Amino acid sequence: MKEHKARKRFGQNFLQDTRIIGDIVNAVRPQADDVVIEIGPGLAAITEPLAKKLNRLHVVEIDRDIVCRLKTLPFADKLVIHEGDVLQFDFNGISGKKKIVGNLPYNISTPLLFKLAEVADDVADMHFMLQKEVVERMVAAPKSNDYGRLGVMLQYFFDMELLIDVPPESFDPAPKIDSAVVRMIPVKHRIGKADDFDHFAKLVKLAFRQRRKTIRNNLKELADDDDLQAVGISPQDRAEHIAPEKYVALSNYLADKAV
């Protein structure tokens, strides 16, 4: 079969390290009847060992050449191939609690993670290969340099853990950055639930717009000092010092106040 060359516009770096591949599959723990969706199967490094354990495997792939390759594989009868852009894919169109896995293209990782957060209620767990610095931002705790908007928003939906460090030489072509595998499990019992999620998302975005400024300055168009203090936030704090549940509490307080 003709060798497939990685395409930069699709952010393709193909995993080839068999040890890492095995570790990822073991982390996913696929059972025969599981509903599993793989994003960006590429050259089937993870696809093949997953398919061996599953009755059916959904794959989402934008590269037409790779789609053609997938159709010729010995286990192609187990694959349900969805050709297209994963950012436009309807995850709710596949019924059942889903396990989602993939080596995510670095150039669309953040918008894709936010899209997946929208379907968290229908997800069992997710395992993704990502740029390591992105994973560190996802799992970061308050008062750390990596803690920011991405972490707050995703921690609202998921419990997350950095599972596996992946060096550049595990890929072909080798990227110029380190990678990591993250496990994401939907939160079962949230400390607080946002009454108006759009308001909560806007508040968090504004809070981190200028990290060096105080929360008072960043949120001045939404909240005054009394509002902040009402939920236990010091107006002098910076955004990275404030836990996710405090942002939820502030959003709910402001929403109630506006009624």
UniProtKB/Swiss-Prot annotation:
Q: Which PROSITE patterns match?
A: RRNA_A_DIMETH, SAM_RNA_A_N6_MT
Q: Which top EC class applies here?
A: transferase
E.C. number(s) listed in UniProt:
2.1.1.182
**MF terms per GO, please?**
16S rRNA (adenine(1518)-N(6)/adenine(1519)-N(6))-dimethyltransferase activity; RNA binding
Q: Where is the signal peptide?
A: none
Protein location = Cytoplasm
Q: Name one Pfam family in it.
A: RrnaAD
Cystine residue pairs: none
Which SMART domains does the entry mention? rADc
- Residues binding S-adenosyl-L-methionine are 13, 15, 40, 61, 85, 103
Q: Which UniProt keywords apply?
A: Cytoplasm, Methyltransferase, RNA-binding, rRNA processing, S-adenosyl-L-methionine, Transferase
Q: Name one GO cellular component term.
A: cytosol
| This protein's record includes keyword Lyase | no
Regarding protein family, the annotation reads: Belongs to the class I-like SAM-binding methyltransferase superfamily. rRNA adenine N(6)-methyltransferase family. RsmA subfamily.
Q: Which NCBIfam families match?
A: ksgA
> What is this protein's function per UniProt?
Specifically dimethylates two adjacent adenosines (A1518 and A1519) in the loop of a conserved hairpin near the 3'-end of 16S rRNA in the 30S particle. May play a critical role in biogenesis of 30S subunits.
Q: What name does UniProt use for this protein?
A: Ribosomal RNA small subunit methyltransferase A
Organism field: Neisseria gonorrhoeae (strain ATCC 700825 / FA 1090)
Gene symbol of the encoding locus: rsmA
